[in-house]
């Protein structure tokens, strides 16, 4: 199939050499802006579907780019954006159909009473606005967040992102932010190993219930609880059953509202539902969406209830976002949602996700370096460990696998989690069975190499230990021989 720019008769701009690109980046881009594969970064010049191509034409299978939700440069999405850009793009203070059609389609996917939209340009902006809505509605300040959470790069959302503020050099957490344990039943504060018979959802909800009770005792309550429906940076975490129901009840009893951050996991990725929060049978008060919504184009939205939206309007301060809800962004978002429906991508994510989980669990039975496999749809995490019984994370192996998958197998994956030992899979939704098998084949080779290296290290250590024992025994024997010789000389001298 021709690339999208070829279908539209567009001519790609002339490329710099990779060396020149790196040189200019080092000169003009802040060093805090990190790259994948920093020792040998990829220069990507084209994309198509689930594939990306470097400057030499090498094709890579993309297993991490949930930004390109329906596939890189999907022709219908590209066409919709190009057509609207060639027609008109302006701010949303003028009437235009793409905005209202986008809002209608987006809210039609939401449960009642989530029916009012505010459009933004990114997940960070969406979460920032969600906190504003919550604090305005409740007239409170305090926010509960989860450990290892990441909600964006703006100051307001960095404050509720332990993934960032707990790093070396991170700013201290404000007193009005309360951090509860991430509901990770494999490697978190409470594990299914420690509490094999416990209700893990209730157990992890308890710290939040205690925070709410303390806030009420002080006469303050809380403004909001914010959480990703499935935590991504925390290591592809699926909360235990009943967790969000118990948490939402506690937060609302303390006067707060519940914010679902769907920036990473929304728009059908989990397969069983359009939104990941639906897997827990809860209805948030505010939902934040972005990233996959624009398939690589900057667009996002906050969806909330008429009551919360009206309270925001009642302040008398108009909300205006120059690019939020512009015609081009909305045309692209509309095209993305059409493609999800027309190509049945949600159902495909369900079927393929089940296949990936099943096959990764087969690998777990074969390779001791896999501690846990978890996921929903095309959101999968594979936790690598040094010791399965003790669940000791293996960050070194995870990094080695990520780089070997790229260099040898031309498959792009990443690692994350508090110990950076979880292999993450979040591919474009056009990912297919053949792609899954390609990943599995390369991953198997990497795991085989990891285990062979461990065996070699263990054998080497055992040989070194044996050599040490032999050397010690030899030295002891020599010492005893010398002792006997001295005793013999003494006897003869007498």
UniProtKB/Swiss-Prot annotation:
Coiled coil: none
Domain of life: Eukaryota
Modified residues (N6-(pyridoxal phosphate)lysine): 291
Record keywords, A-Z: Lyase, Pyridoxal phosphate
Molecular function terms, GO-annotated: ethanolamine-phosphate phospho-lyase activity; pyridoxal phosphate binding; transaminase activity
Pfam families: Aminotran_3 (PF00202)
EC number of this enzyme: 4.2.3.-
Cofactors named for this entry: pyridoxal 5'-phosphate
InterPro entries named among the record's database cross-references: Aminotrans_3 (IPR005814), Aminotrans_3_PPA_site (IPR049704), PyrdxlP-dep_Trfase (IPR015424), PyrdxlP-dep_Trfase_major (IPR015421), PyrdxlP-dep_Trfase_small (IPR015422)
Signal peptide span: none
GO biological process, any: response to nicotine
Record-stated family: Belongs to the class-III pyridoxal-phosphate-dependent aminotransferase family.
Protein name: Alanine--glyoxylate aminotransferase 2-like
